[in-house]
Amino acid sequence: MLPPQHRLKRTSEVALVRQQGRSWRHPLLILLVRANGQEISRFAFVASRFVGKAVVRNRAKRLLREVVRHHLPHIGTGWDCLLIARAGLSQASLEEVNAAVGQLLTRAHLLQENSD
């Protein structure tokens, strides 16, 4: 589970990331990022009905949370991030999702230099 201080909780915070954030796309997901001026990075996860029914959407969000939790020690501070699942994510394995998130974090320059 992602620690509470690393979660975007308010709808208004997620809306700000959607409106003002910069985006990077991958066939499995979309990453939107906005600077938050804080000493931590926070995350939210979205899976719309295009991904599938409720069970499939919840699995997609669980996969994304687990992958971000794994990358969290290597992610720079001061960012609000929104990960939006795309339809292909429902059939993807944990390794594929991990690779996709890693690629997007690298392209967004969010991974610190000493990360693996």
Residues covered by each model-derived region:
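Positively charged, solvent-exposed patches that mediate nucleic-acid binding
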Residues: 1-116
